[in-house]
Amino acid sequence: EFNVHVFDVCVAGGATQAQIGAQTVLVGGMDEMPVTAKELIGIYADEIIEAGPVGSGAALKIAVNVMTYAQFAAATTAHDLMTTTGGNPQALFNAWKHMGQLGTLTEQFSLLLDIPSEHFVGDFKEKMMTQVGISQKDLSLAMDLGWPRTGMVGFLQGIHDAMPNVYNAYGTEQ
């Protein structure tokens, strides 16, 4: 009676990408999508990625976020390894970048790693706590949605539990 179409379109990219018209959309159900809907998506996205049937766009968004949070956790761990052994953490990121392993988002995140803990206070700490909440929500959803390979749920749970430390946003209890 209402001629309703269902598909999913998840947006990837933050405020900076939105300002320059460089959003990426992850689409589920694109084959069933009316032309007018595809045209609308094309207005605000410079990259449209077909993920599969309805629901796949959301699954892809969560999967991309899992990869991002795993990289943030790895970057934090590697940074700490370098600093606690007296090494230069910038050398780590230079090597990672030169070998093609460092993406833009993780490179931007890495700038947080040199900020001393005592500066994570007030509004700044609240912003980091918000990021912790978002990351833990996404990682919990990934564990609920997927059936990871044997042993991988523990890996995801470890990343989930590490997020307060990754964002240097833990409370006094650490």
Regions found by a protein language model. Give the residues of each.
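Helical "substrate-binding/catalytic lid" subdomain
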Residues: 57-174
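Rossmann-fold dinucleotide-binding core
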Residues: 1-65
